[in-house]
UniProtKB/Swiss-Prot annotation:
Belongs to the ribosome modulation factor family. This is Ribosome modulation factor. It is found in: Cytoplasm. It comes from Aeromonas veronii (strain B565). HAMAP family: RMF. The keyword Cytoplasm applies.
């Protein structure tokens, strides 16, 4: 059960990073101190930035 809880937390961190990227926040806005969660947040943020670069999101 422990692994699932950790995975869910990391998936949530990635989703929040993605949302932050979609609205154009800087990567320094990452709220996570834990390296695992921070890495997932930044991964989501990078995915969103790539989407913005390819015109996936319009303001």
């Amino acid at each position: 059960m422990m692994k699932r809880q950790k995975r869910d937390r990391l998936e949530r961190a990635r989703a929040r990073g993605y949302q932050a990227g979609v609205v154009g926040k800087q990567k320094e806005a990452c709220p996570y101190q834990c390296l695992d969660a921070r890495g997932h947040w930044l991964g989501g943020w990078r995915d969103a930035m790539e989407g913005r670069g390819s015109g996936l999101f319009m303001k």
